[in-house]
Amino acid sequence: MAAPVYADTSFLVSLYIQDANSVQAVADAAKLLPLCFTALLEHELRNAIRLCVFRRQITTTQREKALHDIESDKAAGVLHAVPLDWPKALKYAEALGRRHTEALGARGMDILHVASALALKAGRFVTFDEKQRELARLAGLNV
């Protein structure tokens, strides 16, 4: 079995909400499926979609469609629910923060995503966030 692909929230939002990166996200996702989907990713993705409503980037109807599509993709295995070993992920997170936050300005959630990918032994990490991409690269992930 191939190593899992970890797509961060910036990538996943572009799959479910039309934005400047959506065309690229759809093209990339077609080659990378299935995408591992942790409880952390699910929470942040659902919240990011709701935040798009607050920012008036999408309507409530678009929000409901996006949330429905996420559930459909979970059921179809496009988003593959995986358990996360939190103690292991938090160990990685502490090490990443200690090594890279002061130089990169890495945010806590970005560190948690990269640490989660490491804990899951992800074969690939996909993101549209430049700082997170650099952090993942420095952590040894294929980005």
Tell me what each language-model feature is.
Residues L40-R99:
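Active-site-proximal, substrate-binding regions of enzyme catalytic domains
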Residues E130, A139, V143:
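C-terminal binding/interaction regions
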